[in-house]
Amino acid sequence: LNELFKIGDIIYVKYLNNNKYSLKQIPKANGGIVVMDPYTGRVLAMSGGFSFKKSEFNRSSQALRQPGSAFKPFVYALALENNYTPSTLILDAPIVLNQGVDLKKWKPENYGKKFYGLSTLRTGVEKSRNLMTVRIAQEIGVDKIAKFSEQLNIYENPEELISMSLGSAETTLLKLTSAYCSFVNGGKLIQPILVDRIQDSEGFTIYNSEKRECKNCKDVSYLSKNLPRIEDDLSLI
């Protein structure tokens, strides 16, 4: 510690136990995290940064960031909707694309700057292959990818550029997490719920976010073989 600090330095520490402390510091970079129930949309946990006192900016719901490779699974999901199969072969090889007048040609690369020839769709998403993703986007059309991203509420009026297939457009972590819920719940569109219910001073519920109905709950008893059937009206993507 003598190499790091000198007498008079003001530092942050965290109390552990038995009069022991660990060093703590304000991070130079902040981030966000969202934990969501994929079936109801309830936000179970959300953090928008290190300290609300130091910054009220919520990096989970307000910060626009490029999702990058986190967007690729949606491109592959759309490919499955357009007659691709997990075993469809796609060329993983260098490609050069024109971006327009007076613009440099775009030459996307895989991470590691290697390419592997014909590979299956499954391999493309498992290994996060950039070149395969771009070729899929070329074949199914960037317009379809843009429309699909709007249906999932990831982007609003995205510019139809082929680079968006690699996650170049911007969105929030909350929107991206909501879209990922569709992979878990069978393709249903989820809206994030931050307020579960509101009750007045007498305990009466004046607002409830729960929209699902249990249509046979009255017919279910302890000895009954019937199980509660909870149905929702969520739309399929």
Question: What role is predicted for each listed range?
Answer:
Residues 39, 84-145, 189, 201-237:
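Conserved catalytic neighborhood of penicillin-recognizing serine enzymes
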